[in-house]
Amino acid sequence: MRDLIGFKAVAVHAHPDDEAIWTGGLLANLAARGADVTVVTCTLGEEGEVIGEPYQGLTNKNADQLGGFRIHELHKSLSLLGVRGEFLGGAGCWRDSGMIGDPANEHPRAFISSGDKSIEQLTEIFERLQPDLVITYGPDGGYGHPDHIRAHNITHTVAENMDIPRILWAVTPRTELEQGMAAITTLPSGWRRALPGEVACVDHVDLTIALDDHAFAAKAAAMRAHATQLWLADATISDVNPHAAIAGVADPKAAPLVFALSNLIAQPLLDIECYQLGGGTPLTSNDPTEGIR
C-alpha cells in the first residue's frame, strides 16, 4: 500500500547500527508505504568494540579505522531498509564520544561537545527536508549513552523551533522484553543472560507498531549488516564474524530471533517496535502518521 507518497520522515541517530536496532521496522514500513525517509547519523561509531576476530585491528586501540568500516555497514543497512542517509556535518565531522568517563569524551571532535554548530547543521537538514515526522531517543538517550542524549537534545532544539508536526522517541517495552528473554532457553557459547535492570526498558509506551513480515525481515537484515557490532543467533556467518551462533527459543512469538551486542548479552529481537510521543500532534492510533498527513 503506497499511501504515504509525499510524506517525509527523518530519524536522528547517534551511531551506525542505531537506525536498525531502535527504528529499523518503522523506517522500513514507512519507506515501503512510499514515504521519503532519511536517517541522519551523528558520528561514525569510532569507539565501538568489534565482534569477530578478522577486524579487531580496526578498533580505537589499534588502527582506529573502525569508523570508516562502519560507513560501509551503514550504507548496506540503509539500502536494506529502503531509506536514504546522511551524516550530520558530513562523514567524520563529529566523533563518537564513548561512554561517560571515557577518554574519548575529551576528543576535540567529540559529539557531546558539538555545541551550536551541530544545531546549525541539523537545522539546515530539517529546513531542507521539511519532515512531517521526526524520530529519535528520549531524554535519557534510551540507555544513557552521552551521544544518544546529545542527539535527543539537538533534535528537540531544532524540531521545536521549526514546529515539527510530531516527534517520536524509540523505547524498549519492559513486558515484551522480559517475556522475550524468558523465552530464550539455550544460549550460544560465550553468551550470557542479562542481570536485572541491565537492559534499558520502559513501563509506558504511547505507540506499539506490529512489524509485518517485510518490516521485520528488513530490520533483521539491516542488523546483520552491522556485523562488527551485532550478532544474530540464527547461524549467520560473514567475513567479519565467521562463527555461527544458534539460540534455543521456547516461544518464537515472544522471541522471533535472538541477538547480542559486543557484550554478548542475549536479547530477543521483538516483532514490535514501541515509541513514546516526544512532542507535537497527539497520537490517535498505532499508525504514527495518522493526524499529520
Swiss-Prot record:
Sorted UniProt keywords: Hydrolase, Metal-binding, Zinc
Enzyme class, spelled out: hydrolase
Keyword Heme: no
Catalysis: reaction(s): 1D-myo-inositol 2-acetamido-2-deoxy-alpha-D-glucopyranoside + H2O = 1D-myo-inositol 2-amino-2-deoxy-alpha-D-glucopyranoside + acetate
Any single biological process term in GO: mycothiol biosynthetic process
Residues the record lists as binding Zn(2+): 15, 18, 148
Cofactor(s) needed: Zn(2+)
Protein origin, superkingdom: Bacteria
A Pfam family assignment: PIG-L
PANTHER family: 1D-MYO-INOSITOL 2-ACETAMIDO-2-DEOXY-ALPHA-D-GLUCOPYRANOSIDE DEACETYLASE, N-ACETYLGLUCOSAMINYL-PHOSPHATIDYLINOSITOL DE-N-ACETYLASE-RELATED
Protein name as it appears in the record: 1D-myo-inositol 2-acetamido-2-deoxy-alpha-D-glucopyranoside deacetylase
